[in-house]
């Protein structure tokens, strides 16, 4: 806890949302140039690096930079998933697959803040949560990288 006022802290959540909106739109052009799978690998890695920036944040400006960076990366991943699922599994399966993926994400979004608060209450720090996020991002990046060996259309 860095002693940031509640209203300012809530503003950081808005910055995550703003970054996410930008990431959802901006990734299209990048994915068209480099391919969807390389783009999602890049964005998964970017998200992990954003978590590292969060770990080192010492004030509001650094947290704001993290919020925008994380939002951009997260928004890009969210927007790429439907297209990659369509490329890999076709139209017949995409609805069920996306429903499963986004339901899993919803549980994470619902339970994550409670888990982070619980960890903070026990350890007095968010560091274990942040390092957990870094580890999960590394796993997601590695899993996404495995798709590079598959023949998935660029668009």
Name the predicted role of every residue range.
Residues 33-44:
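Cytoplasmic membrane-interface "Motif A"-like loop-to-helix N-cap segments
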């Amino acid at each position: 806890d860095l002693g940031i006022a509640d209203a300012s802290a809530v503003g950081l959540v808005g910055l995550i949302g703003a970054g996410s909106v930008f990431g959802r739109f901006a990734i299209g052009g990048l994915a068209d140039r480099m391919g969807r799978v390389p783009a999602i690998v890049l964005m998964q890695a970017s998200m992990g690096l954003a978590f590292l920036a969060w770990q080192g944040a010492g004030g509001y400006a650094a947290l704001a930079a993290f919020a925008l960076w994380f939002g951009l990366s997260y928004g890009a991943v969210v927007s790429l998933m439907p297209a990659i699922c369509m490329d890999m599994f076709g139209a017949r399966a995409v609805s069920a697959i996306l429903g499963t993926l986004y339901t899993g994400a919803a549980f994470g979004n619902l339970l994550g803040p409670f888990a982070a608060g619980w960890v903070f209450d026990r350890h007095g720090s968010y560091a274990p949560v942040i390092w957990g996020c870094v580890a999960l991002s590394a796993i997601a990046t590695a899993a996404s990288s495995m798709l590079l060996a598959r023949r998935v259309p660029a668009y």
